[in-house]
């Protein structure tokens, strides 16, 4: 039984799963989970792809016919700030399967350029954003829920030393 988070990162584009990217993704997920008070060992599966790959997944899973920067597929229907409990752990591994995230590395590069910051910061931001979705946060409205999610994202980015 694992006592730490398990974060497998796979890629279907060459070079995306570099040691540096995998280390940043793992550190970001661990930091975001800790910031949200998640102490039980969790599994988060990460796929790094390109615009074509994420477009295909977006169409298949959400019937949205366009690429996006990040997709999150939570295992649980949680309210913001709610955590799955030990009873949700896989009996074989002892891990709580939080869900999956898919990131377009093309969007990471384009958005980093657009927003005038590093790819490293953009990747960490999108990973943080996805973790919060896995934990029940959302931003469908332009009101308090979106503000709450943005505040949590900025808090995690500050912990990572990657604030704006």
Please describe what each predicted stretch is.
Residues 1-124, 132-164:
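An acidic/histidine-cluster motif and surrounding catalytic segment
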């Amino acid at each position: 039984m694992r006592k730490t988070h398990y974060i497998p990162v796979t890629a279907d584009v060459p070079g995306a799963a570099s040691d540096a990217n995998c280390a940043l993704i793992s550190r970001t997920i661990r930091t975001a989970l800790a910031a949200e008070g998640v102490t039980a060992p969790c599994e988060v599966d990460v796929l790094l792809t390109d615009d074509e790959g994420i477009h295909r997944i977006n169409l298949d899973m959400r019937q949205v016919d366009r690429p996006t920067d990040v997709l999150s597929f939570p295992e649980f229907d949680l309210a913001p700030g709610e955590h799955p409990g030990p009873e949700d752990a896989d009996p074989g591994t002892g891990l709580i399967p939080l869900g999956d995230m898919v990131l377009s590395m093309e969007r990471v590069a384009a958005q980093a350029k657009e927003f005038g910051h590093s790819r490293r910061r953009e990747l960490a931001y999108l990973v943080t954003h996805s973790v919060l979705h896995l934990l029940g946060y959302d931003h469908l409205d332009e009101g308090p829920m979106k503000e709450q999610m943005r505040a949590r994202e900025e808090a995690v980015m500050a912990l990572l030393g990657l604030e704006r």
